[in-house]
Amino acid sequence: SSFTIYDTDDSLRVVKDCLKDLNIDEKQFPPRSVLGYISRAKDAMKLAEEYLADCERAGDFRLTKIAKVYVEYQRRLWEASALDFDDIILHTVRLLQQHEDVRAFYQRKFRYVLIDEYQDTNNLQYLLASTLAGGYENFCVVGDDDQSIYRFRGATIENILSFEEQYKGCRVIRLEENYRSTKHILEASNAVIRNNQGRKGKELWTKAGEGDKLT
């Protein structure tokens, strides 16, 4: 059957309506923040009723209220025959995990899987991509662990940091030559990022000149 895809604005509108009808104060529970919690729950593959049960079991009053919004939010999406962006991936992953014939069909269909900006992928995106690549295991990812800036949107740096462990036979190509910056800028950048212990490690260099000193 057909369905409608809700973008972020649509989802926010539904969350606001849910808060209003559940008599929950928007000032204490900002709609965008609530939507973020819902998105992270879906990224963890927690369906609404399951998430509510977990929050009630933990005795977390605030999260329980958010979970009740999640339940109502999903009910309204269902009534509208709508999916949000997270639902699209979540239901696809669940379909592939639960139906071996469907999984095998799409694993045969996609001989190569390539992902750019892999450091910005979340759990659901990882599960979808790795499942599709599970047939031929021709899985190529491009990313920079030093440029992971979207954790607030659910991105998990562990996806790229653990790639070599998950795919033992993979080949890692470090792209360390920089074409945009001067030597002084790269030296400063290398010195700063070197303090981050949670990275693969690389040393940027350039054929460009020294450039101006940093002030």
Which stretches of residues belong to each language-model region?
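Conserved coupling/interface region of RecA-like P-loop/ASCE motor cores
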Residues: S1, Q147-W205, D212-L214
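Short hinge/gating elements
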Residues: S1-S2, K20, A53-R57, Y73-W78, ...
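Conserved P-loop NTPase-based nucleic-acid remodeling module centered on helicase motor cores
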Residues: S1-Y37, E50, R57
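Phosphate/oxyanion-binding loops and surfaces in catalytic or ligand/nucleic-acid-binding neighborhoods
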Residues: D21-D25, R40-M45, Q166, A188-N196
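Short, well-structured alpha-helical segments
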Residues: Q28-K42, L63, A67, D86
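Alpha-helix N-cap and coil->helix boundary residues
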Residues: F29-S33, K46, L83, F105, ...
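Conserved helicase NTPase motor core
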Residues: A58-S162, R174-H184
